[in-house]
Amino acid sequence: MYKLKIFSYLPNPRVWKALIAGNICGVEVEVIGDKPANLGTWLWDFNPKMLNEDELNPDHKYARVGKRGFSGVLYKTDSFLKAHPFGTVPAAFNPEGNIGIFESNSILRAVARVGKEFNLYGQDPYEASRIDSFLDANLVFAREAQVYMLDYDNVSEEGYERMTAAYEFYLSGIESALEESPYIAGADLSIADISFVCDFSQFLREGHYEDVLKDKGFSLIAEKFKDEYPKTLKHLISLNKRKEFSTVLGTYLDWYKSKLQITRK
């Protein structure tokens, strides 16, 4: 039986964090969801379901005004909002459905804490806190990246500079960490590595909008990633090749590896 259930829009690299961790530490994670545009036709709940066409109206007892990335009417049960006060996805639940866990790194932590087959969260409270430090730094980067990636067509000079600064600060820290140890937080693989792979792989998708950015006078922020952060690139590609990662990420990074002429070995 699953140890964690997640409802989200799909595909979602942030959900992949929990799935990869589950693969490594032996935790079954159930994921239910749909394309972002379709979530307005779902009842958001511990047991989510698609609504019938005649149920889709603003007078439905669970109709709510969409916020943060969703417009129009959404359908969220009272129990969903009790478990998830911010009403966002991905939304995770314990097996009983009475405890909600939100924010992808917190969901990732939950999987690591439940998992017994492999320790992904440090050998003692100090190592765990160091891992948390990287997760917090990752969150700052990911928040800035989300704003940038959601509106390439209208990115401003100020927004571009903010994203560039966040990128350089985050990547320089990861590069420095990897100069001292084989994994981001130390000698062992941890959820810090998993979070990095998923969020940074998503950021690299800016490459698909190169022409849009050029039309606005901007170059790709990650254009010189290979040369400026070689250890970070090597770490990203190395983890992507591991079965626990590749079965979740699939071909998500293939376009980028092809661009850099990185072969599958």
Locations of regions flagged by a protein language model:
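GST-like domain detector, emphasizing the conserved glutathione-binding G-site
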Residues: M1-T164, F169
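A short, structure-level motif marking secondary-structure boundaries and short turns
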Residues: Y2-K5, S219-A222, R264
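A generic structural-conservation signal
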Residues: V31, A187, V248-L249
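C-terminal/domain-terminus segments
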Residues: P36-G40, T247-K265
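Short beta-strand element of the conserved SAM-dependent methyltransferase core
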Residues: A92-N94, L239, I262-T263
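GST-like fold's C-terminal all-alpha helical module
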Residues: G122-K241
